[in-house]
Amino acid sequence: MTAAVLLARTERVVASVDCALGPLWHPVRLAEDIAMADTIGGGRLIVTLGLGYRPVEYELFGTPFNDRGRLMDDLLETLMSLWSSPEFTPGPLTRPHPTVFVGGSVRATARRAARHGLPLNLPSHLPELADYYRELCADAGHSPIVVMPPPRSRGMVFLHEDPDQAWAELGEHYLWEARVYSGWSGGEVHSFMHGSETIETLDDVKAAGRIASCRPSS
């Protein structure tokens, strides 16, 4: 809904939801929300659907973590079916369906995207997974579309009349967010936003370049 508000108040900005944890959504509700935001924005909406990697998030919704792959497959099938049905009204503006990427970092993600003929959103450190996806798309007769934004591009921008003052006032909160988020990484899991580096100090946050404090243009 935040994307819908942004799109309603702009004319050229593209809103990218990256990413929504698909298995935690009711399929029909998600289809309705995406269709509405797509229409409000005149087709300027991009949604990446992922599984997530934190069991606690599934526990909060009472959803079995080990079922997330099956639930995602069911979700994608339901979304495509609803958006193509004349009985689903109001339908999305973008046809045959809104722009939906499948996001993740494992081979099952590539197989899922190729099977449904959907574009793939990967971390930049997994070129071999992009190649695997392209091979699968070629076998299935789909045109592969893959984006691999580097961690730095997945940052946050804060607007303040005095950017230096913003760092002074909000720096401890920037640091808390960065340390918690990067702390979720481990083993084969890498935070899409903060990568695998260690964040210990506010200087580390600034050096990473993924939080920007900027002065709004007049």
Where do the protein language model's features map onto the residues?
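Active-site mouth loops of central-metabolism enzymes
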Residues: 18-28, 96-104, 157-160, 208-216
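A short, GP-enriched loop/loop-strand-helix hinge that lies immediately N-terminal to
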Residues: 14-18, 47-50
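N-terminal beta1-alpha1-beta2 module of alpha/beta enzyme domains
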Residues: 1-10, 14
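Internal, glycine-rich beta/alpha segment that forms the wall or movable "lid"
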Residues: 23-116, 121-136, 140-147
